UniProtKB/Swiss-Prot annotation:
Pathway: Porphyrin-containing compound metabolism; protoporphyrin-IX biosynthesis; 5-aminolevulinate from L-glutamyl-tRNA(Glu): step 1/2. Homodimer. The record marks 99 as: Important for activity. Pfam families: GlutR_dimer, GlutR_N, Shikimate_DH. It is an enzyme of class 1 (oxidoreductase). One of its GO terms (biological process) is protoporphyrinogen IX biosynthetic process from glutamate. Keywords: NADP, Oxidoreductase, Porphyrin biosynthesis. Its EC number is 1.2.1.70. This is Glutamyl-tRNA reductase. HAMAP family: Glu_tRNA_reductase.
Length: 421
């Protein structure tokens, strides 16, 4: 069994495509079931965040699994495969393990060292567990990935002074306004990203925090944390003009704000500029807003350019983290290889035991032996089988740790005619 990853991220695909292939919590269970119905996919997990959609799979045929999944991702979102597949990457075996460990440790994140991705990966794993789409391989892989991420965060400085997407958004606002003191902000959404943004905004002196959310009670709870004000999502249009800075991160599949709403808000503001940051995928803010005078719209792709400075500053910590990952990757591969060899070794031993039992049954019946002598013969036969099987099975177990270990398993199966039955 091999580990396979097929996906796209902020480096391989623009936000306009990432939002089209994103998975919502409502559709995820159905998609996980459909994924594991693909012929070459034995286990599957879907990781869908604002910056990536990745399919983690266990398969005996990595090439077939990758090909089937690449087509399936497009079909599952009613897209033309020709528009999706050029942006996909495929990783298998040790490369897939290394990539997954890097993702969990935030080395592959847009913001190097951010903490959100580990929680998102844990949630993706829990969703797959609930859907029954994981098994022995992915269960072990994700547990190993989480332990590796923990080592990276505790043994390196990767998490020190790291920024999040939310804090990067606030830094962008500071570049536009300079001093944020005296400015007001509106958060559309009440999840973790918006809460993080609110904390950074208040730290930098924002005078008023407004919050709206589809679930009004959550908006109230978040606003109260910052002595702010909440209003129902239905009142968004009539309140938009109150904000100098708008940060949006919801799970909506439709635009929350369009150009006409912004034009009306600017009219009420007497054309004072309004700064909008969309950190949602799919996007909350219609891209056409960027064409409106005095409205300055930024999305995840814009933030990606801004946080590159942070990535360069953290290169030394990233190098130390990669050393940990390079050490953990072969450990998982070795376990995976032994997983493949165990059934073969069991079959070899069962075949030897069956031959022993057949011979004992044939000959002992014609021998006039006491119970004690019969027991001695049976013990001798058992010891002989164990002795003869010990070296071949232990050697086979050892050889499977090599890069071409599969061929030794195949050879053993042919020599012992394990697939002839």
């Amino acid at each position: 069994m091999k580990l396979v990853v097929v996906g796209l991220n902020h480096k391989s695909a623009p936000v306009s495509l990432r939002e089209k292939v994103a998975y919502s919590s409502d559709t995820l269970p159905r998609s996980l079931q459909a994924l594991t119905r693909l012929d070459a996919v034995h286990e599957g997990t879907i990781l869908s965040t604002c910056n990536r959609v990745e399919i983690y799979m266990a398969s005996r045929d990595p090439d077939a699994a990758a090909a089937q999944t690449s087509q399936w991702i497009a079909r599952d979102h009613a897209l033309d495969p020709a528009d999706v597949t050029p942006h996909l990457y495929t990783k298998a075996e040790s490369e897939a393990v290394r990539h997954g460990f890097c993702v969990a440790s935030s080395l592959d994140s847009m913001v190097l060292g951010e903490a959100q991705i580990l929680g998102q990966m844990k949630q993706a794993y829990q969703d797959a567990l609930s859907a029954g789409s994981t098994g022995v391989v992915l269960n072990r892989f994700f547990q190993h990935a989480f332990l590796t991420a923990k080592r990276v965060r505790t043994e390196t400085s990767i998490a020190e002074n790291s920024v999040s997407v939310a804090s990067a958004a606030v830094d962008l606002a500071k570049r536009i306004f300079g001093d944020l003191s005296g400015h007001s902000c509106l958060l559309i959404g009440a999840g973790e990203m918006c809460e993080l943004a609110a904390r950074h905004l208040v730290t930098h002196g924002v005078k008023e925090v407004l919050v709206t959310n589809r679930t009004f009670s959550r908006a109230v709870d978040l606003a109260q944390q910052f002595d702010g004000h909440a209003f129902p999502i239905e009142a968004l249009a009539e309140n938009l003009h109150r904000a100098d800075i708008v940060i949006s991160s919801t799970g909506s599949t439709v635009y929350m704000v369009g150009p006409d709403m912004v034009k009306q808000a600017l009219k009420s503001r007497r054309q004072r500029p309004i700064f909008l940051i969309d950190i949602a995928v799919p996007r909350d803010l219609d891209p056409e807003i960027g064409q409106v005078d005095s409205a300055f719209l930024y999305d995840m792709d814009d933030l990606n350019k801004i946080v590159n400075d942070n990535r360069q500053d953290r290169a030394e910590a990233a190098q130390a983290a990669m050393q940990i990952i390079e050490g953990e990757t072969p450990l998982f591969i070795q376990w995976l290889d032994t997983l493949d060899v165990v059934p073969t070794i069991k079959q070899m031993r069962r075949k030897a035991e069956a031959a022993k039992d057949q011979l004992l049954q044939k000959h002992l019946a014609g021998w006039d032996l006491s119970d004690t002598d019969r027991q001695r013969v049976e013990n001798l036969a058992r010891q002989l089988v164990n002795k003869l099987m010990h070296d071949p099975t232990e050697r086979l177990r050892s050889l499977t740790n090599e890069h071409d270990g599969d061929r030794y398993i195949d050879a053993a199966r042919k020599l012992y005619k394990l697939d002839d039955d």
